[in-house]
Amino acid sequence: MFKTILLLAFWGRFRLGELTVPAQDNIKIEDTVLRLDVDLIGEEHQEQFLRVWLRKEKAAAHRAGSLVEIPKLPANLKKLCPFRTMTRYLQRMDKAGMSRFDPLFTDLSGSAMTPGKFSAGVKDAIRTTMPNIGQELFKTLKNHSCRSAIPTICQELECFIDKDILKSLGRWESDAYLQYLKSYQGALKTRRFVEEEIIKKISEARKQDAVFFRQT
């Protein structure tokens, strides 16, 4: 379950609070991703997607939810593929009798995943698998660590994604995604790139206008 949550949050740019419930005695159906909100789309040897209906977004409560699609990753990334991991998780939970109206991440005892339980599980896994650095590594992890991953990776690889595309992928209403960039220089590079693209587009538009007026 923990791996499924991590991969879903990473590739789907989810906030942890969007995939968990505040507490066992505070489950609001209208704010929770349920089993029925998740679909696996497509057939084998065709384009396949993991589709998640997010009923309520923290930063866009005025919207009536949001549809998030994550493609099945290529074979060389299968261990990091949320589609494959979710497929196995749903098969296991459906066999165990999970209701379509249960919170998506519910264990076999019927308890839904909370932020506290998730944090404790990740902390234990890191300490167990990386005893030498696990303690220090866990200190740097935050609830938004998965959500910030895509902007950070784009920065590290110097892969400058169009601002509007990046904001759309992460469902950011503002330029808040810039806060997730891990280095000041990287943030400046991203801003400069966006500004240069704007200038370039304006310049191209002016050139087209000039050509039009010369022809007329």
Regions found by a protein language model. Name each.
Residues 18, 81-88, 117-124, 150, ...:
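Acidic, Ser/Thr-rich intrinsically disordered and amphipathic helical segments
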Residues 168-196:
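Catalytic-site neighborhood detector that most strongly recognizes the C-terminal catalytic loop/helix
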Residues 9, 20, 167:
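The alpha-helix within a helix-turn-helix
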Residues 189, 193-216:
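C-terminal secondary-structure termini that scaffold catalytic or DNA-interacting sites
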Residues 21-83, 88-91:
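Conserved tyrosine-mediated DNA breakage-rejoining catalytic core shared by Y-recombinases
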Residues 1-17, 79-80:
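Basic, Lys/Arg- and aromatic-enriched nucleic-acid-binding interface segment
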Residues 70-119:
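Conserved, ordered domain cores of eukaryotic regulatory proteins
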Residues 92-96, 119-163, 168:
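Short, basic (Lys/Arg/His-rich) helix/loop patches that form interaction surfaces
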